């Protein structure tokens, strides 16, 4: 029974995401934050494309004091969404290699990098590199700390 339920769920998810990409390019509504680069709208998880935020258990160091910068990045994304009354508007771009929906969410992707709480994910896109350079120069967010790039941290600790 569990196997049948899993198969049916997979088929429905596959159909639903195919329909989203075929018919709709945007999804908007009340958003909840999963982590520093993932939100959920209408039950759909959307990975913010072109950026990479610290992992939820990732530590960074400010003045030699460790803090959970993954949690800080998540809280910053929550703050950005609250400015828009808890809503987000995202354009679907693609699926990543794990099957997650990648989206460019109006004002969110760029703000996370510009405010220094995510890095430009240059492995996939240089779109946010300009904003990263500015944040780094101004020592905003992560750039005021000692940190591993999230991709490096995942290689070391996951």
Predicted regions, residues:
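Small beta-barrel nucleic-acid-binding modules, primarily SNase/OB-fold domains
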Residues: 5-6, 10-11, 16-158
């Amino acid at each position: 029974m569990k196997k049948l339920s899993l198969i049916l769920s997979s088929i429905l998810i596959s159909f639903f995401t195919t329909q989203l990409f075929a018919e709709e390019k945007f999804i908007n509504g009340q958003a909840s934050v999963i982590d520093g680069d993932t939100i959920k709208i209408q039950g759909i998880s959307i990975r913010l494309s072109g950026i990479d935020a610290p992992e939820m258990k990732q530590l960074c160091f400010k003045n030699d004091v460790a803090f959970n910068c993954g949690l800080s990045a998540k809280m910053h994304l929550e703050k950005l969404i609250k400015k828009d009354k808890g809503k987000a508007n995202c354009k679907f771009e693609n699926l990543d290699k794990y099957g997650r929906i990648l989206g460019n969410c109006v004002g969110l992707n760029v703000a996370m990098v510009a405010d220094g709480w995510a890095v430009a994910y240059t492995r996939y896109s240089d779109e946010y590199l300009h904003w990263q350079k500015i944040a780094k120069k101004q020592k905003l967010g992560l750039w005021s700390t000692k940190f591993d790039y999230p991709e490096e941290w995942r290689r070391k600790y996951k």
